[in-house]
Each structure stands twice: as C-alpha cells, then as structure tokens.
Amino acid sequence: FPYTTLFRSPNDPTNGGRALILLDKAGLLKLKDNKNIASTKADIVENPHNYQIVELEAAQLPRSFEDVDLATVNTNYALEAGLNPAKDALVLEDKESPYANIIAVRQGDENRPEIQKLVKALQSEEIKKFIAEKYKGAIVPAF
C-alpha cells in the first residue's frame, strides 16, 4: 500500500490504539509497544512507507472508503455498513485478543447461581454456533 491513507478515531482513543496495534500486527508500521492500547500516532517508531494516518470518528470510517486506500473499522460499524469483515479485512483481531467482551460482576456476586447459569449459557457451544452462523467469522468467540 504505497502512500496509503489510514483512518482511525480520535474520539475513541481505545479503538484508535487497537487500530494502530492491528497495523503493527500486519507489518505496515511499528509501534514503541504493540500491546499498549493507549498508543497514538506519536508512538509510531517505524513508518517505512510514509503512510499518512488521518483520524476520523469511528462511525464515519465505512463511509470514507472511497476516499482512502485502507481503513481500520470496528466490526459493529463494518457490519452496519454491509461489509463482511471475515472476507473484506486484511487483518482481524483473533480470539486471543485482550479486548474481547467479558462478563463482569461485582466482587462477591461471581458465585451466585443465576450468574453461573448466565455464564454457562453465554459460553455454550450453542452460542458459539449461533455467533458463527450469524456473523460468519466477523465476530470470533473468545471462549
């Protein structure tokens, strides 16, 4: 991607850092610390192709495709725009991503029967199959 323009969201620093980490993972640039979710453009230590990184609100990214060569897009916005991340993406976070959604409860509530039942249901093979069928690889179960 010579002289590619990349977009990321300044209004959402967490996902901006995730985007840079993905670009590092893809070998397009190198960050000081490719595990630092708070990474910004200032943390790029190597940009051998002089990519221009333009920041844009995450929800606008799918609409910007005609103006750029490459964009980093959150899965929810990609799906809303009719994209198929499993086919359209060059790089995706995998099930080992530390940014997977989690089930969180207050300390002391983790052993409540209804919480245990919910966790068991949400992490079942039935739910895994539902995710696979519904999202066709765009969302990867992290359990």
PLM region descriptions:
Residues 17-24, 122-142:
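Periplasmic-binding protein-like
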Residues 20-22, 42-72, 77:
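Short helices/loops that flank or line small-molecule/ion binding pockets
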Residues 69-70, 82-96:
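Short beta-strand->loop
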Residues 7-45, 125:
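Bilobed "Venus flytrap"/periplasmic-binding protein-like clamshell domains
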Residues 18, 111-121:
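Short amphipathic alpha-helical coupling segments at ligand-binding clamshell hinges
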Residues 11, 75-77, 107:
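Short secondary-structure boundary segments
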Residues 1-6:
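Short, small-residue-biased leader/transition segments that mark boundaries at the very start
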Residues 7, 100-114:
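A bilobed periplasmic-binding-protein/Venus flytrap-type ligand-binding module shared by bacterial periplasmic
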